[in-house]
Amino acid sequence: MSVISMKQLLEAGVHFGHQTRRWNPKMAPYIFTERNGIYIIDLQKTVKKVEEAYNFLRSVAEEGKDVLFVGTKKQAQEAIEEEAKRSEMHFVNNRWLGGMLTNFTTITARINKLEELDKMEEDGTFEVLPKKEVIKLKNEREKLEKNLGGIRKLDANNVGAMFIVDPRKEKNAILEAKRLGIPVVAIVDTNCDPDEVDFVIPGNDDAIRAVRLIAAKMADAVLEGRQGEQLAE
């Protein structure tokens, strides 16, 4: 049984690539044909590549390592958050802050600040502070939550893989992963460079349904791997 079927991929529109004038020639092996000025992705290859990525992420989770889900474009934000939470993993879906992995000490300080502001809100500190001050602190908290909420519990040393939607948009995340030797799994559209990615999943990175389908399969892989890890214990 394949991890994913051609029918599922077709229904989610995974086969629609970008316009032919916006393409990366390195994606040629994954292109099936061209229709009305748009490249059509070879879904037989996608089926195979989803399977490879699935098996890899499952083995990462089996080893007790974490997977960081990254997708900051509008079409990916919701699916990235939901699927990361479902598989009890970490995510970045608003903005990749420079040094998120390579300068984790600074990021940790900001996460601590977020925790501190949460505590102030919970223990009633906000109620005794001047209104102006509270508004300022609440705005700061909101901004930190937006950018760092998904990595609050992250241990940067335990990231075994990164799952990315659109490597072109997330080039900074990829650079940091490369520097730290973290393998990257990504949905790669016809306008991206597949050489930047360790596990290429050729597919449409602009359709919400397509992104959700593949992100869900990657989360399933993590869940299956975690089950295996528990059984091994």
From Swiss-Prot:
GO MF annotation terms: structural constituent of ribosome
Coiled coil: none
Protein name per the record: Small ribosomal subunit protein uS2
UniProt cross-references to InterPro entries, sorted A to Z: Ribosomal_uS2, Ribosomal_uS2_bac/mit/plastid, Ribosomal_uS2_CS, Ribosomal_uS2_flav_dom_sf
GO cellular component terms, semicolon-separated: cytosolic small ribosomal subunit
Key word ATP-binding present: no
Keyword Ribosomal protein: yes
